Amino acid sequence: MCGILAVLGCSDPSRAKRVRVLELSRRLKHRGPEWSGLHQHGDCYLAQQRLAIVDPASGDQPLFNEDNPSIVTVNGEIYNHEDLRKQLSNHTFRTGSDCDVIAHLYEEYGEDFVDMLDGIFSFVPLDTRDNSYIVARDAIGVTSLYIGWGLDGSVWISSEMKGLNDDCEHFECFPPGHLYSSKDSGFRRWYNPSWYSEAIPSAPYDPLALRHAFEKAVVKRLMTDVPFGVLLSGGLDSSLVASITSRYLATTKAAEQWGSKLHSFCVGLEGSPDLKAGKEVADYLGTVHHEFTFTVQDGIDAIEDVIYHVETYDVTSIRASTPMFLMSRKIKSLGVKWVISGEGSDEIFGGYLYFHKAPNKEEFHEETCRKIKALHQYDCQRANKSTYAWGLEARVPFLDKAFINVAMNIDPENKMIKRDEGRIEKYILRKAFDDEENPYLPKHILYRQKEQFSDGVGYSWIDGLKAHAAKHVTDKMMLNAGNIFPHNTPNTKEAYYYRMIFERFFPQNSARLTVPGGPTVACSTAKAVEWDAAWSNNLDPSGRAALGVHDSAYENHNKVNKTVEFEKIIPLEAAPVELAIQG
């Protein structure tokens, strides 16, 4: 994939404007370090920084169709591009890139082709005959995208906020599953699945149908001409992804080029739950496993870079992004260009521990719908930007359109967590892969309790962040938090600390409005906090905030903030700085 920047309909076609667009495009170079391209057509500029995954030798982007009326700058992976090429048999393609089909589809079908694409994408095709264009983003928002408007009437599009925040009067997140058309200067939703209305589905649970749908989602993402690996924390989601990948890798074109031995990667503090579980799964599957350890101080030292790259002040996103950011640097240094990861399962199946308190199947289902619709501001943003900070791509099969349709049409009564019946979180997913004759995973891994990524890398990671923030944010500062930050006012010192850093990089009001807010417990939406009255006194995105559910739950709110006791255990000043790489 890539980093894209488009400036459309600007009033200044001068050389200075072209230089400025190039300068802004270079802010995205970490996303695509292998090729820089810029095409100007009148008052429109299309720029691209390319990370080559499919047909890397083709190079040149933005992409054109055969006689040049359509030009496209695109960040994406189109998994059904070979089938689409067959439908476009009257067209001549210049490259073997999967994204080459987009310009041709735009010429052939106009604005009505987006739903034909099976993949993840953000793109801007420009018709040079009349300077019309559309902008589109994938169904769930796996790829990041922003839209802004200049005082001169120009429309700006960028993969990251840093590409447009200094030059736009107003900007915002481009909504997932939508397209923007220059012909009516407005948005419309192209992604219209049945679950989007939040109506309660009634389809019976079919374990084999669910299993086969997910296997297809994983296998289609093995499309590659470059080395890749799998992120393996040892939790259910990443372990299933690794298991399926290792089973089917030998049958793919990727195995012919790079061998059938799968490389897996895990990160954590020394002795963390994820490192232990990840190694156990890797040994079971026979992967070439790489463990990356970091210290609390390593993570703290990276916080400013993480906030700059991930472009958020959301507490849970920063907690989870930091280990992923550190791991991505190491993975890229090994020559790997993309990884397959397990984001999205918890939203689809109600895997977060607070779902234990869902009062009925209706509220359970409505919460999963809310969580999926918000993914682009949380886990998708984290997975996309913390990896792309180092030119590494993350693919997420749980967010496959076809798989989501299967999973979200199951009667939610089957997803409800019922301990007295032995049904833990994500039970129907676990059961679908519980194969006695040809097991995908060891039983205790298949039924391991949910760990949020920021918890699984080591519980002292979050405790260390809180202790560090307490050194930099005083009680007096917290008293004035509402005056300093009236929007999404931070209610903890940790949140205040992140907000200060974010505002230094992105001081515009539009920037702070791109970050979600509201009360949360264990990553819930604000609505789900109402499920348990006790949660309102223990608001924290960590899974350990789900009192009475998590095996290592916080005993009470005061225990969370015992900074002095924590520093007796791990003196932050003495923590080593170097990242250790093992295996």
Swiss-Prot record:
It is an enzyme of class 6 (ligase). Keywords: Amino-acid biosynthesis, Asparagine biosynthesis, ATP-binding, Glutamine amidotransferase, Ligase, Nucleotide-binding. The record marks 343 as: Important for beta-aspartyl-AMP intermediate formation. Residues 2-185 form the Glutamine amidotransferase type-2 domain. It catalyses: L-aspartate + L-glutamine + ATP + H2O = L-asparagine + L-glutamate + AMP + diphosphate + H(+). ATP binds at residues 231, 267, 341-342. Pathway: Amino-acid biosynthesis; L-asparagine biosynthesis; L-asparagine from L-aspartate (L-Gln route): step 1/1. Pfam families: Asn_synthase, GATase_7. Roots. L-glutamine binds at residues 50-54, 75-77, 98. The keyword Amino-acid biosynthesis applies. The keyword Transferase does not apply. Residues 237-516 form the Asparagine synthetase domain. Induction: By darkness. Its EC number is 6.3.5.4. GO terms for biological process: L-asparagine biosynthetic process. One of its GO terms (molecular function) is asparagine synthase (glutamine-hydrolyzing) activity. The active site is at residue 2. InterPro entries: Asn_synth_AEB, Asn_synthase, Asn_Synthetase, AsnB_N, GATase_2_dom, Ntn_hydrolases_N, Rossmann-like_a/b/a_fold. NCBIfam families: asn_synth_AEB, PRK09431.1. This is Asparagine synthetase, root [glutamine-hydrolyzing].
